[in-house]
Amino acid sequence: MAEAILAAKRQELALLRRIEERILWLASWTIHNANHLRESRDGLKVGGHQASCASMTTLMTALYMKALRPQDRVAVKPHASPVFHAIQHLFGRQEIDQLQRFRSLGGAQSYPSRTKDKDDVDFSTGSVGLLSLIHI
């Protein structure tokens, strides 16, 4: 009996790991597409934070795929928005064209926004730290 439970847990962890890899790939692709593949009239890169995404992918995969209940709410770290959008895409709440248009008009936002994003954002988490510059 214990062996069967252990085997089931191993399978579940392996599945979560595969989902995590897909989420990280989608998040990295979203940023790469915005900076290198999508046409840009002025040639400027739009940014994106792949390291911030990579640092949150395991945690966000565990939360969204296993731990969160329907009544739970999450404030996503702003620079991890591509991970959030990738998860929402896997849930069917975010279209691939939103990821393709990341940080452009009508695309997925660089910071989770309750008013601008089409997916289900619990809390808007805009750019942090810039407000303090207004007072200087």
Regions found by a protein language model. Give the residues of each.
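Short, compositionally biased low-complexity segments
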Residues: 1-6
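Cofactor-binding active-site loop characterized by glycine-rich and histidine/acidic residues
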Residues: 8-23, 27, 31-41, 50-134
